[in-house]
Amino acid sequence: MPLKHYLLLLVGCQAWGAGLAYHGCPSECTCSRASQVECTGARIVAVPTPLPWNAMSLQILNTHITELNESPFLNISALIALRIEKNELSRITPGAFRNLGSLRYLSLANNKLQVLPIGLFQGLDSLESLLLSSNQLLQIQPAHFSQCSNLKELQLHGNHLEYIPDGAFDHLVGLTKLNLGKNSLTHISPRVFQHLGNLQVLRLYENRLTDIPMGTFDGLVNLQELALQQNQIGLLSPGLFHNNHNLQRLYLSNNHISQLPPSVFMQLPQLNRLTLFGNSLKELSPGIFGPMPNLRELWLYDNHISSLPDNVFSNLRQLQVLILSRNQISFISPGAFNGLTELRELSLHTNALQDLDGNVFRMLANLQNISLQNNRLRQLPGNIFANVNGLMAIQLQNNQLENLPLGIFDHLGKLCELRLYDNPWRCDSDILPLRNWLLLNQPRLGTDTVPVCFSPANVRGQSLIIINVNVAVPSVHVPEVPSYPETPWYPDTPSYPDTTSVSSTTELTSPVEDYTDLTTIQVTDDRSVWGMTQAQSGLAIAAIVIGIVALACSLAACVGCCCCKKRSQAVLMQMKAPNEC
């Protein structure tokens, strides 16, 4: 048989097979060769028929179906996944899911269900995931789930539940994920979860819970995530989590917690994320956190904390992110951050800090980003960053800084982001070392806002980087010499140097210091080959050399910079919600 005949036969067989696959597909639906059926559209008001007998996945979405009658899926017993979402569904007849013994996934989310018939899920012996979220359910009863012994995931969030009766989940011994968030729960019985020994994720966020009784979580020995944020909890019982040794993520943010019992976090060796932001905490006592050797993130912003004592975080040896912004912190003890040798991100912005001890950050050898903006800092010790050699980003904007110590940033070779704007900089002769360092490291300041002078009044509003500072010199008679050329402004660059920049105190002499020295030396009439005095020639040469070096540094920053500018997604927050719905 010629080759073209084989090809025609092959095409014909494929077309015939495709016709079989699509046989029985309703006109309102689309059916694929992979036994997947999707029925969507407002024109659909009832379950389309006939459905393909071999369908394994059926989706009915965005229709005007208001009820499911008995046995609409009787002829598709091989169905494994059924999604009936975003419809007008308000009533389901018992027996609607009859003959679906192979069904493993059932979603009735985003409908208008208020009541679940008893026995609705009878016969669904293989069901593993049941999604009832975003409906209008008013109550659940133990009989609703008594036939779902294989269930692993139950989603009930986004309903109108006010109470969970004892025994509601007693038959769900294999359940690993339970979501009860976004309801109207005001109270949880200490016995409601006692048979859920395999549960790994429990979410109770965005309810109206005011307290959690002792023993509520005692039976949840395998729990890994507990979400209690956005409730009205005012007090935590000391032993509330003492039996949850496998807990990894604990969300307690946006409640009314005003104090933490001394032993509340003592039995959580696996915890790696703890959120307490948006509460009413006023103080943190030493040892309150720990021992938690695996904690990586601690979120404490938006509280009323006023001070940080010594060793308050000393048990958190692996902590990498510490967020203390938007509190009322006015004092930090020199040993407050003892033990935080692995910390990468420290946020202290928007507090009431006026002064910092020179040793307060000495233990933070691995710190990369520090946020100190929106405080009242008047000065910084010269050794404030002495042991923090890996800093990449420093936020100091919107403080009360008038100057900074000589060489404060010289050793920070990895620094790629420095924010100094919105400070009342005093642009007199004392500002020259800082001005010269900024001139040589201008790309690190960013392109949005640069620091400007606040005083004296005659230079207010002028850029600190390009300002000409009049240096007072001894009163001696000197011939007229050209004024020192204005420091050139170099274009900003999005890149940042990845090696230590030349500072004003090391390899390059301060240009204004040269100017001062030259004007105090007795000047002769000897002229150079350019027709200048020696002082004029030296001044011109110094200006040219400094300009070339500054330009070279700026160009090197443009070409060679690959400094990491990574910013923790926790500080930008945003101050956004830390766990999924």
Curated annotation (Swiss-Prot):
Residues 499-509 have a biased composition (Low complexity). Induction: In fiboblasts, expression is strongly induced by TGFB1. In chodrocytes, expression is induced by IL1B. (Microbial infection) In alveolar cells and fibroblasts, expression is induced by Sars-CoV-2 infection. It is a single-pass type I membrane protein. LRR repeats lie at residues 54-75, 78-99, 102-123, 126-147, 150-171, 174-195, 198-219, 222-243, 246-267, 270-291, 294-315, 318-339, 342-363, 366-387, 390-411. SUPFAM superfamilies: L domain-like. Residues 489-509 are annotated as: Disordered. Residues 560-581 are cytoplasmic. It is found in: Cell membrane. Keywords: Cell membrane, Glycoprotein, Leucine-rich repeat, Membrane, Repeat, Signal, Transmembrane, Transmembrane helix. It comes from the Eukaryota. Residues 1-21 form the signal peptide. GO terms for biological process: host-mediated suppression of symbiont invasion; negative regulation of protein localization to plasma membrane; positive regulation of cell migration; receptor-mediated virion attachment to host cell. GO terms for cellular component: apical plasma membrane; extracellular exosome; extracellular matrix; extracellular space; plasma membrane. InterPro entries: Cys-rich_flank_reg_C, Dev_Immune_Receptor, Leu-rich_rpt, Leu-rich_rpt_typical-subtyp, LRR_dom_sf. Residues 22-53 form the LRRNT domain. The keyword Translocase does not apply. Glycans are attached at residues 75, 369. Residues 423-475 form the LRRCT domain. GO terms for molecular function: collagen binding; fibronectin binding; laminin binding; protein sequestering activity. Residues 22-538 are extracellular. The chain crosses the membrane at residues 539-559. The keyword Glycoprotein applies. Pfam families: LRR_1, LRR_8. (Microbial infection) Modulates the ability of SARS-CoV-2 to infect host cells through interaction with the spike protein. Does not act as a SARS-CoV-2 entry receptor but sequesters virions and antagonizes in trans SARS-CoV-2 infection of ACE2(+) cells when expressed on nearby cells. (Microbial infection) Interacts with human coronavirus SARS-CoV-2 spike protein (via RBD domain); the interaction is direct and sequesters virions at the cell surface. This is Leucine-rich repeat-containing protein 15. It comes from Homo sapiens. The lineage of its organism: Eukaryota, Metazoa, Chordata, Craniata, Vertebrata. The gene is LRRC15.
